[in-house]
């Protein structure tokens, strides 16, 4: 007695691909939202004079697996790491990006993990 079983691989392949696409979409969305959490923490740490620096901190989706959180002003770098004035004195850095990133690291990881395990 012989039993033959045949499986239509195209159905299985399509189902697997659909699930992979769904996971990729969820991961990209979770990553972007994680970037938003980091941006908010950086904005909260940002010193304010006119508010331009704080409002310039944005999230950009680079790819499905990468986001960039960055300020977009000419002077953001100098506020972050410090600088010398024309008279030669040193203005220390505020490290608002570094501190915001560090403060939000664990909550961002938890958020992304929770979105991918639903």
Model regions and ranges:
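Short, Lys/Arg-rich flexible segments
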Residues: 1-118
